[in-house]
Amino acid sequence: SYVGSGQMDGQFDFNVYDDAVATFARPDVGFQRLNNSLEESFHYYGVHNMMSYISGNQDRARFISYAAGDISFEEDSKIAGWKRKVGERKPSDETAYDKLIQLIAFNATIPGIPVLYYGDEIGMTGGNDPDNRRMMRFQDLSEGEKMVKEKTAALMKFRKSSMALMYGDFIPLRVENKVYAYLRSYFGQDVVVVFNKEPEEVTLKLDLPQRDRKGQFKALFEGRFSYDNSKLIVD
């Protein structure tokens, strides 16, 4: 209600954030919920909007603590933050680092402005305020924290250099319980983003709009794929 002509240009999109947290942290929440929330925001604010898509916030428990199961979605995260130090220094389940990178990758590749809450770039733990305001750490990082830091830096560097991610159309390619794929496209420059919540590898055949593309696709991380100008096969 505060975003519009003569008002604010943008604010935190908590509707998308809350659904993103549930989707990436919980195995029982499918990507349909997140895609619906994102499409609803596009309806209200437009695809090329100035809304901020956040990794965390001082009014929420840390995502990684939800993802690791160190704090429950059913409990009051603010009370938890006052009564105990959630997760101590690192999450109890280190697969939560991978889930956090998925959340950050989502924010970095959708329209809008990606925003990192301090500490999320290394996966700091914590409940709600004041437990999510711990002192920032810059040294003695674990292997999981180093991985999150390196991939976050790569994602943000890519975001800053990609016209498709900054200005491109948003086209969903696959929206399922465990798999989410979409295309960002800007005048022949395309970026395909794929998320997989399955515990094992999956092979996807994605139909892409036929057009002349500038150059070939390259994997940002270690993903494997093949491509023939209209179909992208991702392993």
Where are these regions (language model features)?
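Carbohydrate-interacting/catalytic domains
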Residues: 96-97, 109-116, 124-235
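Short flexible/disordered coil segments
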Residues: 25-30, 49-67, 175-186, 227-235
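Alpha-helix-centered segments that form part of catalytic cores
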Residues: 94-102
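Active-site-proximal helices and loops of the catalytic beta/alpha 8
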Residues: 1-54, 125-154, 163, 184-187, ...
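A generic structural motif
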Residues: 16-18, 81, 219-222
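Short amphipathic alpha-helices and their capping/turn segments at secondary-structure boundaries
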Residues: 39-45, 103-110
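Aromatic/acidic polysaccharide-binding cleft in carbohydrate-active enzymes
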Residues: 3-6, 53-85, 104-144
